[in-house]
UniProtKB/Swiss-Prot annotation:
Single GO BP term: cellular response to phosphate starvation
Native source organism of the sequence: Xenopus laevis (African clawed frog)
Topological domain ranges for the Cytoplasmic compartment: 1-238, 291-314, 360-375, 423-468, 525-692
PANTHER family in the cross-refs: SOLUTE CARRIER FAMILY 53 MEMBER 1 (PTHR10783:SF103), XENOTROPIC AND POLYTROPIC RETROVIRUS RECEPTOR 1-RELATED (PTHR10783)
Domain EXS: 435-639
Family of the protein in this entry: Belongs to the SYG1 (TC 2.A.94) family.
GO CC terms of this entry: Golgi apparatus; plasma membrane
Gene name, Swiss-Prot/TrEMBL: xpr1
Transmembrane segment boundaries: 239-259, 270-290, 315-335, 339-359, 376-396, 402-422, 469-491, 504-524
Name of the molecule in the record: Xenotropic and polytropic retrovirus receptor 1 homolog
Written domain comment of the UniProt record: The SPX domain has high affinity for inositol polyphosphates, such as myo-inositol hexakisphosphate and 5-diphospho-myo-inositol pentakisphosphate (5-InsP7). Its affinity for inorganic phosphate is tow to three orders of magnitude lower.
Localization per record: Cell membrane
Single GO MF descriptor: inositol hexakisphosphate binding
Function: Plays a role in phosphate homeostasis. Mediates phosphate export from the cell. Binds inositol hexakisphosphate (Ins6P) and similar inositol polyphosphates, such as 5-diphospho-inositol pentakisphosphate (5-InsP7); these are important intracellular signaling molecules.
Chain spans, region Disordered: 660-692
Length: 692
């Protein structure tokens, strides 16, 4: 593998700009070689002056790159040292509290037997668990910094060697010895010391001396490109996709043969939600593949465990497996008409299997990922009671595009409860008009508003935490338009069914709020979620200054499809109002539902790209995990103090507060360090420990 490819595959994406610009140096050398005056048409002194001038410019550029790398490395090393001190203080506090609570072991054991764990014991257990996770993430950040150190040194060595080869000189090697090999980023070995200390602390203090267990916890995933999936996973993906296509064809043929002249809409509404969920999972697999290929660190953005998370192959496998179940269930439902089987049992079995797959408590079938999803769903539905993270509102946004699944679930419950004739085998294709598909009882309107309500209260919670009206209250206003839109749609539908004269008034109000909602969400998609239409876009017209995906056409096509699909409701309303054909509303909504899932699939690419670029701007490459983080009010107060012009002048007034809140930078003495002297952290001495 060429070093350019190796560098591209192994860099930390959020630090991309801080690495040596190896490709730019290569282009610089090749351009100098191509543009050099020929010795055949000019004198030797002119050629020497040309190369001397080029080398002066080349080494000046090398000095700038070296200074950039030294500065960034020193900053990240200082940050790592501060983080190490903080974690060790937290660990020491937790261990001290644990020792204090075990002063009376006999009484404690008896109390455990009677009352189980006390609140203090549960808190201590949770703190230790959080500390293990925090040290694991900190260790990952150290490995990333060590990798940064090694890649940049190798980059300088390679490019200076190439310089000497092209120019037939040894000045590149001399410059490397004189500058690179004595540079702080290369000579400073404190990163190795921090790595060793972290391994020792985790082994002795958190894993009771079991080094194998400690290193398994600290294991860092490969820093290169995504590792290939196991052969059996790839085989199963292909097998499931092949079976799905064959059975899907059989479903179409069976439906054409057995369902002619029957009212299939109850069955369609019941099975439609399952299909949309499978489509969503498959497209999410494509999202994951695209993010990995483009260098968008979705693992960090969603705060997943970098050592254990689902790849695109796993998502394809799950989607394929569920797709086969869906096809067999639908085929059995249709084919059951010819042999008098109870067709209405098939959907119950299908969704029962899906539910069991999700909540299965055994540690099988992607247990950690399923548990993460269940925990995230719980956080989404309890949004007002805790701080909202990116994964929380991302999932709530997905639910807004999957709202029809909730509506179909409501229809299914209503249909099975009130309309289904359980004694007939053809219960899902009866010709009776469905009341459950209307807004008559108001439940359907409430269900339709649930996803928008979740995002609405998330925005209010974020406003409470940050005290920033923009963007959070403005974003909440965007989701509130859905409430008006659904309300007027329900009023129009019920008044029209009862032939009330004011139905047209509600129809026009529905159209107005639908238009306002579509414009609102479209502008927010393009400007806020995707960060497009930046004034400083430069050559990336109508986009942003920096883009991740290789072709600008991707962005322009995404803008066009977002505009079209945001206003696709106009087709549905027009066709339904004109009543161009039978069941026009159901047909159009069934076509538009998968298209909305596709729109959200495209949205995901650019929403995470925008978040990734924000992380790049902050050079954030690992999760921020602390046992005792600042609460939202403290964080807001600190930000306000930092924004004040006289904040520095008046800092003496808060000296008492600072003294009580600040943390000593002296490392706490743990049992694993009992023979080591206390050492203060040195922030500005990254060049005083040369080791060449």
């Amino acid at each position: 593998m060429k070093f350019t490819e190796h560098l591209s595959a192994h860099i930390t994406p959020e630090w991309r700009k801080q690495y040596i610009q190896y490709e730019a140096f290569k282009e610089m050398l090749y351009a100098a070689q191509d543009q050099a005056p020929s010795i055949e048409v000019t004198d030797e002194d002119t050629v020497k002056r040309y190369y001397a001038k080029f080398e002066e410019k080349f080494f000046q550029t090398c000095e700038k790159e070296l200074a950039k790398i030294n500065t960034f490395y020193s900053e990240k090393l200082a940050e790592a040292q501060r983080r190490s001190a903080t974690l060790q203080n937290e660990l020491q506090s937790s261990l001290d509290a644990q020792r204090e609570s075990s002063v009376v072991p006999g009484l404690r054991q008896r109390r455990k037997a009677v009352f189980a764990l006390t609140h203090e014991e549960r808190v201590q257990h949770r703190n230790i668990k959080d500390l293990k996770l925090a040290f694991s993430e900190f260790y990952l950040s150290l490995i990333l910094l060590q990798n940064y150190q090694n890649l940049n040194f190798t980059g300088f060595r390679k490019i200076l060697k190439k310089h000497d080869k092209i120019l037939e000189t040894s000045r590149g090697a001399d410059w490397r010895v004189a500058h690179v090999e004595v540079a702080p980023f290369y000579t400073c070995k404190k990163i190795n010391q921090l790595i060793s200390e972290t391994e020792t602390v985790v082994t002795n203090e958190l894993e009771s001396g079991d080094r194998q267990k400690a290193m398994k916890r600290l294991r860092v995933p490969p820093l290169g490109a995504a590792q290939p999936a196991p052969a059996w996973t790839t085989f199963r993906v292909g097998l499931y996709c092949g079976i799905f296509m064959v059975v899907n064809l059989a479903v179409v043929m069976a439906g054409y043969h057995f369902l002619q002249g029957k009212n299939v809409w109850p069955m369609v509404r019941i099975y439609r939600g399952g299909f949309l969920l499978i489509e969503f999972l498959f497209l999410l697999g494509i999202n994951t593949y695209g993010w990995r290929q483009a260098g968008v660190n979705h693992v960090l953005i969603f705060e997943l465990n970098p050592r254990n998370n689902l790849s695109h192959q796993h998502l394809f496998e799950i989607a394929g497996f569920l797709g086969i179940l869906w096809c067999f269930s639908l085929f059995s439902c249709i084919f059951g008409l010819s042999i008098n089987l109870q067709m209405h049992l098939n959907p119950l079995i299908l969704y029962g299997i899906m539910l069991v797959f999700l909540v299965n408590p055994t540690k099988t079938f992607y247990y950690k990922s399923r548990f993460w999803l269940l925990k995230l769903l719980f956080r989404v539905f309890t949004a007002p009671f805790h701080k909202v993270g990116f994964a929380d509102f991302w999932l709530a946004d997905q639910l807004n595009s999957l709202a029809i699944i909730l509506m179909d679930l409501e229809f299914m419950i209503c249909f099975y409860s009130f309309e289904l004739n359980w004694g007939k085998s053809e219960g899902l294709v009866e010709s009776a008009k469905s009341v459950c598909n209307s807004y008559s009882y108001g439940v359907r309107a409430v269900v339709q508003c649930i996803p928008a309500w979740l995002r609405f209260i998330q925005c209010l919670r974020r406003y409470r935490d940050t005290k920033r009206a923009f963007p959070h209250l403005v974003n909440a206003g965007k989701y509130s338009t859905t409430f008006f839109m659904v309300t007027f749609a329900a009023l129009y539908s019920t008044h029209k069914e009862r032939n009330h004269s004011d139905a047209q008034v509600f129809f026009y109000l529905w159209i107005v709020f639908y238009f306002i909602s579509s414009c609102y969400t479209l502008i927010w998609d393009l400007k806020m979620d995707w960060g497009l239409f930046d004034r400083n876009a430069g050559e990336n017209t109508f986009l942003r200054e920096e883009i991740v995906y290789p072709q600008k056409a991707y962005y322009y096509c995404a803008i066009i499809q977002d505009v079209i699909l945001r206003f696709a409701w106009t087709i549905q309303i027009s066709v339904t109002s004109l009543n161009l054909f039978t069941d026009a509303g159901d047909v159009i909504s069934t076509v538009l539902a998968p298209l909305e899932v596709f729109r959200r699939f495209v949205w995901n690419f650019f929403r995470l790209e925008n978040e990734h670029l924000n992380n790049c701007g902050e050079f954030r490459a690992v999760r921020d995990i602390s046992v005792a983080p600042l609460n939202a009010d403290d964080q807001t107060m600190l930000e306000q103090m930092m924004d004040q012009d006289d904040g520095v002048k008046n800092r003496v007034k808060s000296r008492i507060w600072k003294r009580s809140q600040s943390m000593s930078l002296r490392r706490p003495r743990l049992s694993s360090q009992s023979k080591m002297k206390d050492a203060k952290i040195l922030i500005d001495d990254t060049d005083d420990e040369a080791n060449t």
